[in-house]
Amino acid sequence: QKPDPSGTAQDIGYAKAKSIALNHAGVSENEAYDMEIELDDEDGTLVYEVEFKSSGMEYSYEINAATGAILKHEAEID
């Protein structure tokens, strides 16, 4: 079963996860490419894994699906 992209009370949704990652990285949506978002279970906690590239950098985020908190993030030269 696919989660609702707009989210629920327990799930912020794909669009919000993407927006949190882009805002944190300081990248606008039209500057990002190769965007990948997936919902994953990390030891019983649902997290969105968000990855994208922009301006020669590769960004990777883990975002708590219930709270929107950034659990882990990396930026490296692509």
For the regions a language model picked out, list residue spans one by one.
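Long, terminal "pre-/pro-" and other extracytoplasmic accessory regions
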Residues: 1-78
